[in-house]
Amino acid sequence: KPSIEAKAPPVRRVTEHLLGHYTEKVTLEELAAVACMNKYSLLRLFTKTEGITPYRYLETIRIGKAKELLAQDLEPAEVALMTGFSDQSHFSKFFKEVIGLTPGQYRNIFKVKQ
């Protein structure tokens, strides 16, 4: 993937916005306004450039942040809220789909053995 600087300006603005607002509910309309494009053109351009939709990109950011927090021994329910997932069930399901482990299993990897 190209670096953030090398991306088309609308895609760069959207990726930067997503990185800064991943804990919030983000809509395609909001992203279209950030990109100064209509939402359908943005969706096509973003998906062509990044290989995934803006929503999947957002969830990827959230999972990355969640991994960091789980490694710090935070509870999965707390991590779900801190990373912008609507509920723990959605977070757990998506985390397992992407990582192959439940959030609790992932967290346990980092627990100090007593």
Model-identified regions with their sequence ranges:
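Proline-centered helix-kink/hinge sites
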Residues: 54, 102-103
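Acidic, Ser/Thr-rich low-complexity intrinsically disordered segments
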Residues: 11-13, 25, 35
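Residues within the alpha-helical elements of helix-turn-helix
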Residues: 34, 82-83, 98
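Terminal helix-turn-helix DNA-binding modules in bacterial transcription factors
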Residues: 16, 20, 25-29, 47-92, ...
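Helix-turn-helix
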Residues: 31-39, 43
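An amphipathic alpha-helical interaction segment
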Residues: 1-17, 41
